[in-house]
Amino acid sequence: MTAHAVRDLEEIVDWIARHDGPDRAQHVLGRIRAAVDALKRLPERGPHPAELIALGIREYRETFFKPYRIVYHVDGARVFISLIADGRRDMQSLLARRLLAG
């Protein structure tokens, strides 16, 4: 997981803990971790984010624990998680800032 993705996950868990309680936050954390762990078995299974396909970018893929989107890329046998975000956010802007700006 990149430092940005770790921070994304911490912010998600903190927000849920404040608004929905620590038990719900731990549940979401466990489900997101399970989705990430599943990538070890079949990393190429995730679709390419539509927002990036529209720009001709097919380097990244995504998996979900709805409403959360986990954006990653595969380099050989390694999977790099680049972004974890609530899919209800403005993903076009978020992906552009995070992935395209460097």
Where are these regions (language model features)?
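Basic/aromatic recognition patch in beta-strand/loop cores that engages polyanionic ligands
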Residues: 42, 47-78
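Enriched for short, Lys/Arg-rich terminal
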Residues: 65-102
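PIN-domain endoribonuclease scaffold, especially VapC-family toxins
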Residues: 1, 27-40, 60-64
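Arg/Lys-rich, positively charged N-terminal/basic patches that mediate binding to nucleic acids
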Residues: 1-31
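Generic structural signal for secondary-structure transition and capping sites
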Residues: 21, 37, 41-44, 68, ...
